[in-house]
């Protein structure tokens, strides 16, 4: 492999170039061969010719299997509840809807939007986590851990207290603002910390900001008597979601996921390190800005509809990288599908684990996510 680096320094620059080339070979290749690059006049032209070797067939299998599981989960989610409905009735209600039948009304007005919301929220949170982990090179990054979710819930609590008649779209906009506030606060604390931004330090900053926003939200809830409304957001769940909420999720998802696919290749390079990304001619600041905008859009929409559902954005990206490799052109769609599958089945379990009462779905995702977080934190203990 030949790279032409324009170096103004002699020994140090050459050593640094060798290290960067080794990182590129080891990480991008994912233990597969990287195709030979012909000689180029500059590094930017060379970077355009890099053939990203990825587990393409594995990614396609993951997508197909994930979509099949999602369809199965959707039918189960629609059929199971306070009153079980036969799968044939579910099929008829979806494809031959008759508004005069009570069972069809229950499916169309209650269970279908709930299932659609669960799938969309899971997908949005999973992609948010994948983007955050790629941008920060932090395996612990996730909307609920990095203060994004709590910032969004904090803004929602303000909206409930001071603007009780706010529309659904207005609530989403407040949620967006809170998500941006939470993310910028955590990043600001991390940047000024001693020793720089290590994964565990960033996670600790996110935890501190989360508790701060949660404390203020609780005080607002008590002072303005909106605790009952806010408790839904902190419990997390998709029960009672209407078609209007699904439409908002679809709009936010279309915008956020389109932007995510647009910067997927850049996030792949950025996940290998800022120095390498800059050496390949990438505008890292612009990529991070767009990436943070994506996280704010996706997380803000998810929290405004379903509340603070934690750890989906932590678990799913790690599973996806294990299955499909490091190419974010595959990580993003596979994370979306697997995130949707996880939350749909978690919502089913939330209805069954303590029937006839419902368990908050956020409690079930936390039950899975907390041990996984401790495992990752233990693995990253050297970053303290």
Swiss-Prot record:
GO terms for cellular component: membrane raft; plasma membrane. Keywords: Cell membrane, Ion transport, Iron, Iron transport, Membrane, Transmembrane, Transmembrane helix, Transport. The chain crosses the membrane at residues 58-78, 115-135, 154-174, 176-196, 202-222, 243-263, 296-316, 330-350, 357-377. InterPro entries: ABC_BtuC-like, ABC_transptr_permease_BtuC. Its main location: membrane. Signal peptide: none annotated. It is found in: Cell membrane; Membrane raft. GO terms for biological process: siderophore-dependent iron import into cell. It holds the Pfam family FecCD. It is a multi-pass membrane protein. GO terms for molecular function: transmembrane transporter activity. CDD domains: TM_ABC_iron-siderophores_like. The keyword Thylakoid does not apply. The keyword Cell membrane applies. Part of the ABC transporter complex FhuBGCD involved in iron(3+)-hydroxamate import. Responsible for the translocation of the substrate across the membrane. Belongs to the binding-protein-dependent transport system permease family. FecCD subfamily. PANTHER family: FERRIC ENTEROBACTIN TRANSPORT SYSTEM PERMEASE PROTEIN, IRON(3+)-HYDROXAMATE IMPORT SYSTEM PERMEASE PROTEIN FHUB. The complex is composed of an ATP-binding protein (FhuC), two transmembrane proteins (FhuB and FhuG) and a solute-binding protein (FhuD or YxeB). This is Iron(3+)-hydroxamate import system permease protein FhuB. It comes from Bacillus subtilis (strain 168).
